[in-house]
């Protein structure tokens, strides 16, 4: 994976960071362990209308198309329109008592998972989301 492919927006202001191959690999491992059951290939099993494609992430409220926004969502998930907190329905750090797979996820893991999610459309194209 080239540095260009591993460069992602880290915030809404457009600042970027390059994730290492190790960070991408760790993000993949955590995604596969904690997220892929419902989000394999970027699809949302419980709601196919909302997926992890760049377009869907950008159109969410607030937009979830950067690392900080995805990390925030994993900590405190809300509906696509941003109005309703859904941590009892969607795995998150806030609901780790209900969703045990979230219990041992670190801040670094969240960062790496977000990078992994943002990488997938670059390498999988239309097969993601």
UniProtKB/Swiss-Prot annotation:
Subcellular location(s) per record: Cellular thylakoid membrane
Record's keyword terms, sorted: Electron transport, Heme, Iron, Membrane, Metal-binding, Photosynthesis, Photosystem II, Thylakoid, Transport
GO biological process, one term: respiratory electron transport chain
InterPro entries registered for this protein in UniProt: Cyt_c-like_dom, Cyt_c-like_dom_sf, Cytochrom_C550, PsbV_cyt_c550, PsbV_cyt_c550-like
GO MF term (any one): iron ion binding
Cofactor(s) needed: heme c
Cited HAMAP family: PSII_Cyt550 (MF_01378)
Cofactor note: Binds 1 heme c group covalently per subunit.
Source organism, top-level taxon: Bacteria
Similarity field: Belongs to the cytochrome c family. PsbV subfamily.
Residues that, per the record, bind heme c: 35, 38-39, 90
Claim: rRNA-binding is one of the keywords in the record: no
The protein, known as: Photosystem II extrinsic protein V
Record's function text: One of the extrinsic, lumenal subunits of photosystem II (PSII). PSII is a light-driven water plastoquinone oxidoreductase, using light energy to abstract electrons from H(2)O, generating a proton gradient subsequently used for ATP formation. The extrinsic proteins stabilize the structure of photosystem II oxygen-evolving complex (OEC), the ion environment of oxygen evolution and protect the OEC against heat-induced inactivation. Low-potential cytochrome c that plays a role in the OEC of PSII.
First and last residue of the signal peptide: none
Entries under Pfam families matching the protein: Cytochrom_C550 (PF14495)
Assigned GO CC terms: photosystem II; plasma membrane-derived thylakoid membrane
Known partners and oligomeric status: PSII is composed of 1 copy each of membrane proteins PsbA, PsbB, PsbC, PsbD, PsbE, PsbF, PsbH, PsbI, PsbJ, PsbK, PsbL, PsbM, PsbT, PsbX, PsbY, PsbZ, Psb30/Ycf12, peripheral proteins PsbO, CyanoQ (PsbQ), PsbU, PsbV and a large number of cofactors. It forms dimeric complexes. Homodimer in crystal structure.
Membrane topology: Peripheral membrane protein
